[in-house]
């Protein structure tokens, strides 16, 4: 049954009249906006309102944001749901001229956009503009967003903390924002109040994001009067004042780790006693959004005890947009950690709501984006394990990071003829449309965006869409296969991926399904089977994306020419993404060949790597030619990696020089079965680290060679070193700075060169360098800094080889050992194998503490070697387990310990063939590449009712005693 509140045609007419009287400038509420849109649609169609009246009803059956249209009755679960129903009705009138049945109950309860304030000069033109905010929230409402998070003070001293820019707290008159007058402060508060209230009028829940309550170490304060003693009481009073002055603020998002500016040992007390208390004491319900990254022990308990509604969020794919699913495994702090834990009683919901943060701040900063299939796949993952939804960072969300001076737009002043928008966010209409409409209704018809392409580009609309869709795959794949830093410090839209040795050293961020260059080489050398994608497949993807984009752009250009304004402002982005795809296709292969050469001394791989980096440089030169003078030279969207493509040219040029040097070393010395680079001490690389890997910690060491310093003393575990320490001196090369290794620095001055000969060790006398080897006889080449070499033949004893330095003074840059025996023939590349049919009936429900069997059917299985199950609790802190089964009967038995009531079960299959390659199921290219089975405590059935007592023959009948 539906409980309905009828809004009569009189209400409809009255509301429309009221809106007309107001000039249509503002919406009194979501329902009024929806009604106004319906009226505009009737007018556009020339239909009389009195003959097309509608009835609106509240429904208790639909969710709050749901709606249905039946005849001329529109039902909604709330005013926002009714607004969505009216917007759908308006679209139907425009498209069809009449209403058609429709019903949507959104699977994602929260659908949010997040925006950051970072630059006073750039924000001056829109932040205080009421027309801007009305247009923005109208766009969000049309696209079915229901949340807007405006974040202040994100890793910057700008507006940190923001409270003194809004209010003066009588108890703390000494706390002031520097250079802000009372009039400016009042204007700031009034603007915040207007933004929050206007959001509400369009059905948008406004969230106030406060990420720093004090500046971080090394920043210049923009606020005076704060001390460690008063910051807590001041924050309590100020936040409370802001919330009371701005009733449209529905929730407050807090960052609570060290990046908040609050020292770790004070964070729990600060938030518990002041910030959370301010929310509780405001006098109305305000939701707490807690960013859960690196919380101190006790902070979650404090939030749960704050007696306000609590939401907890974490990152979907680090601080970038990768593939359309949370990675099966990644750095735990850059994913959902253990936040999807369920309460002890499985029928009880969590004490908090969980939602996903889709960070685009690292990757999708400037260029246009829109791929409906990607969005459909992503939004299907958002409800995983009861999550409430998502918020996402659109392009330009951090424009002007760090309050850098200067005005700049998407294009340079000379290219303003390409500007087809009034507000810059209008340029990204497809991004907003797809993420909003498809998260609200994943079954939305493609005509919603295809009609818009046709309206904007006419007969070329389909080709512009195809170009955009294919170009949009490029950045997501770069993030998935090559993410040098999960933080937003590297900008893949303009970054060439770092120096070639760094590129080859970086792991994929989707390492469960993509092999690193090192892993791929070892798999091939050791004959180890793996279904993971290789660089060859990745490069093929990049070149396919580029080709499809190029072809669609050419077709659109033939129709639109150079005179179409929106096309002229769209095509450059597509061209940039095409070239980025070509570049990374080349660099993927260069890195793959280079790592293979380092393992095998295969000279064809070395020359192939040289060819690929040369090709990559040519592509980057095209990028510079295309973008120079087109996009601004001083673009800043993050704390590092600012500037322009032309600022990065030195890096691919250095790659070419690096490979030239490697080829010259090969020609001069031949293969290095064991290679040692003599120089100063360096740090050991940390396995699986993204900042302390080999290319960073040993950037002054020739790749493929082991670093040797005077302190490198032989031990069995290391397998090489000096027999005795002492008497040795190093002539060291400096490390290449991290920012140059990763191609972040704009003016690199310390790029690597001459690594083997540029540093050295010198000594006097016959010191011995010992190496554990496989083989008997070796030629030892002691390389001098001038490039000449002392050669000798040495023999190993029991797997140990001693190379004696000459008597007298000596100085060497390195040591190469060449086995007299021919090198082993490596495993050939796997031949292609036809993919078999794979079937699995995934259980929807698993009972906790009970064993379960999972069956995978594979047929035909004649080319399948084994089937492997990977499984763990849905917890990024848990370790993946694996078990194998024959393909003829791939049945896996999980024990009772594997079905923990606190966690749902996450699992996927790897099918390995006889060629050493294979397939994953589910397929990462088509679906979320793992299953999530709900684990629930089995509730025993209620006991049967007691049996009726047997009839008593001596008892009198109901009518009384028998006479």
Predicted features along the sequence, with ranges:
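C-terminal non-catalytic alpha-helical accessory regions
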Residues: 394, 398-400, 404-651, 655-666
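Bacterial N-terminal signal peptides
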Residues: 13-24
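Compositionally biased, intrinsically disordered or flexible polar/acidic segments
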Residues: 669-822
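Short solvent-exposed strand-capping/beta-turn motif centered on an Asx-Ser/Thr pair
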Residues: 140, 681, 859-863
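Catalytic-core regions of glycoside hydrolase
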Residues: 48, 94-96, 146, 158-162, ...
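Feature activates predominantly on carbohydrate-active enzymes
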Residues: 29-37, 41, 62-66, 70-229, ...
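Glycan-association/targeting regions that enable binding to alpha-glucans and other polysaccharides
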Residues: 820-963
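Mature N-terminal, pre-catalytic/accessory segment of carbohydrate-active enzymes
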Residues: 26-154, 310, 317, 535-671, ...
């Amino acid at each position: 049954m539906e409980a309905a509140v009828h809004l009569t045609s009189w209400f409809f007419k009255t509301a429309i009249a009221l809106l007309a009287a107001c000039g249509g400038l503002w919406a009194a509420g979501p329902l009024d906006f929806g009604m106004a849109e319906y009226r505009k649609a009737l007018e556009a169609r020339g239909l009389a309102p009195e003959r097309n009246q509608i009835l609106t009803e509240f429904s208790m059956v639909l969710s709050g944001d749901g709606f249905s249209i039946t005849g001329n009755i529109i039902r909604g679960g709330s005013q926002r749901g009714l607004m969505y129903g009216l917007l759908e009705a308006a679209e139907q009138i425009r498209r069809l001229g009449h209403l058609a049945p429709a019903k949507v109950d959104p699977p994602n309860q929260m659908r949010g956009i997040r925006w950051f304030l970072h630059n006073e000069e750039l924000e001056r033109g829109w932040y205080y503009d009421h027309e801007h905010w009305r247009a923005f929230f109208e766009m969000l409402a049309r696209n079915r967003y229901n949340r807007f998070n405006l974040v202040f003070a994100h890793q910057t001293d700008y507006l940190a903390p923001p409270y003194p820019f809004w209010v003066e707290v009588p108890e703390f008159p000494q706390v002031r924002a520097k250079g802000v007058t009372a009039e400016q402060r009042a204007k700031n508060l009034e603007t915040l109040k207007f933004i929050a209230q206007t959001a509400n009028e369009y059905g948008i829940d406004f969230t106030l994001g406060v990420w720093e309550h004090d500046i971080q170490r090394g920043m210049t304060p923009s606020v005076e009067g704060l001390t460690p003693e008063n910051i807590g009481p001041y924050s309590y009073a100020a936040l409370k004042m802001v919330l009371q002055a701005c009733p449209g603020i529905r929730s407050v998002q807090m960052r609570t780790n060290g990046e908040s500016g609050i020292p770790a040992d004070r964070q729990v007390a600060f938030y518990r006693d002041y910030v959370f208390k301010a929310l509780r004491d405001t006098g109305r319900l305000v939701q707490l959004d807690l960013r859960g990254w690196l919380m101190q022990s006790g902070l979650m308990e404090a939030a749960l005890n704050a007696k306000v509604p609590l939401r907890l969020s974490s990152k979907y794919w680090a601080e970038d947009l990768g593939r359309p699913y949370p990675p099966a495994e990644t750095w735990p702090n850059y994913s959902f950690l253990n936040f999807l834990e369920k309460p002890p009683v499985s029928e009880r919901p969590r004490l908090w709501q969980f939602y996903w943060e889709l960070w685009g701040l690292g990757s999708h900063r400037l260029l246009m984006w829109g791929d409906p299939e990607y969005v459909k796949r992503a939004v299907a993952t958002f409800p995983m394990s009861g999550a409430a939804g998502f918020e996402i960072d659109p392009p330009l969300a951090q424009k002007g990071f760090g309050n850098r001076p200067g005005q700049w737009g998407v294009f340079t002043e000379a290219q303003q003829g390409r500007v087809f928008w009034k507000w810059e966010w209008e340029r990204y209409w497809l991004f907003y449309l797809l993420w909003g409409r498809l998260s609200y209704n994943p079954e939305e018809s493609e005509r919603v965006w295809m009609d818009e392409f046709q309206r904007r580009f006419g007969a070329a609309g389909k080709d512009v869409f195809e170009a955009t869709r294919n170009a949009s795959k490029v950045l997501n794949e770069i993030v998935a296969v090559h993410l040098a830093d999960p933080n937003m410090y590297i900008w893949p839209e303009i970054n060439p991926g770092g120096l070639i040795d760094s590129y080859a050293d970086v792991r994929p961020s989707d390492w469960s399904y993509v092999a690193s260059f090192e892993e791929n080489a070892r798999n091939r050398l050791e004959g180890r089977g793996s279904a993971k994608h290789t660089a060859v497949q990745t490069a093929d993807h990049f070149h396919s994306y580029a080709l499809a984009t190029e072809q669609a752009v050419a077709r659109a250009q033939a129709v639109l020419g150079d005179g179409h304004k929106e096309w002229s402002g769209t095509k450059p982005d597509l061209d940039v993404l095409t070239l980025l795809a070509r570049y990374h296709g080349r660099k993927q292969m260069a890195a793959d060949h280079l790592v293979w050469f380092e393992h095998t001394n295969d000279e064809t791989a070395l020359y192939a790597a040289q060819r690929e980096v040369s090709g990559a440089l040519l592509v980057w030169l095209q990028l510079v030619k295309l973008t120079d003078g087109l996009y601004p030279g001083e673009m800043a969207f993050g704390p590092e990696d600012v500037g322009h493509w032309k600022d990065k040219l030195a890096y691919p040029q250095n790659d070419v020089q690096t490979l030239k040097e490697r080829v010259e070393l090969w020609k001069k010395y031949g293969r290095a079965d064991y290679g040692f680079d003599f120089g100063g001490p360096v740090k050991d690389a940390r396995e699986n680290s993204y900042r302390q890997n080999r290319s960073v910690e040993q950037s002054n060491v020739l790749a493929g060679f082991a670093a040797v310093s005077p302190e490198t003393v032989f031990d069995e575990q290391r397998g090489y070193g000096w027999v005795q320490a002492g008497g040795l001196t190093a002539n060291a090369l400096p490390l290449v700075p991290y920012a140059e290794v990763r191609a972040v620095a704009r003016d690199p001055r310390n790029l690597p060169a001459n690594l083997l000969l540029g540093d050295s060790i010198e000594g006097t006398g016959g010191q011995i360098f010992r190496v554990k080897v496989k083989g008997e006889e070796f030629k030892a080449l002691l390389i001098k800094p001038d490039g000449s070499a002392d050669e000798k033949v040495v023999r190993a004893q029991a797997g140990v080889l001693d190379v004696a330095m000459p008597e007298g003074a000596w100085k060497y840059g390195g040591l190469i050992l060449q086995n007299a025996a021919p090198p082993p023939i490596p495993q050939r590349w796997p031949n292609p194998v036809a993919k078999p049919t794979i079937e699995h009936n995934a259980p929807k429900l698993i009972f906790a503490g009970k064993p379960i069997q999972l069956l995978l059917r594979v047929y035909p299985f004649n080319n399948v070697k084994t089937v492997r199950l990977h499984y763990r609790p849905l917890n990024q802190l848990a370790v993946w387990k694996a078990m194998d089964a024959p393909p003829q009967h791939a049945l896996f038995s999980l024990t009772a310990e594997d079905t923990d009531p606190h966690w749902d079960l996450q699992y996927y299959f790897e099918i390995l063939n006889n060629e050493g390659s294979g397939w994953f199921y589910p397929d990462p290219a088509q679906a979320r590449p793992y299953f999530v089975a709900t684990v629930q405590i089995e509730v025993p059935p209620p006991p049967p009712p007691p049996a009726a007592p047997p009839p008593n023959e001596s008892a009198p009948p109901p009518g009384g005693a028998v006479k």
